[in-house]
Amino acid sequence: MAKSRCCGSQSRSRCCRPRQRCRRRRRRSCRARRRAMRCCRRRYRLRCRRY
C-alpha cells in the first residue's frame, strides 16, 4: 500500500520518481504525504500540492 500512495512514501528513490502515478492515484494522499515525504518536500513541494 505504501507504493500506491502519493509519491512512494518510504522509498527515497521512489518518493521523487513516480510523479505520474501520484497524479492518478489520490489527490489527498499527496497533501498529507507531503509532510511525511522528505525527498519530495523540495522537488515535489509545489507539485505535490497539485496532485
Swiss-Prot record:
Regarding protein family, the annotation reads: Belongs to the protamine P1 family.
One Pfam entry for this protein is: Protamine_P1
Q: Name one GO molecular function term.
A: DNA binding
Put simply, this protein is called: Sperm protamine P1
What does this protein's UniProt record list under function?
Answer: Protamines substitute for histones in the chromatin of sperm during the haploid phase of spermatogenesis. They compact sperm DNA into a highly condensed, stable and inactive complex.
Q: What compartments host this protein?
A: Nucleus; Chromosome
According to its UniProt entry, the protein's GO biological process terms are: chromosome condensation; sperm DNA condensation
Which tissues express it? Testis.
Per UniProt, the keywords (alphabetical) are: Chromosome, Developmental protein, Differentiation, DNA condensation, DNA-binding, Nucleosome core, Nucleus, Spermatogenesis
Which GO CC annotations does the UniProt entry carry? nucleosome; nucleus
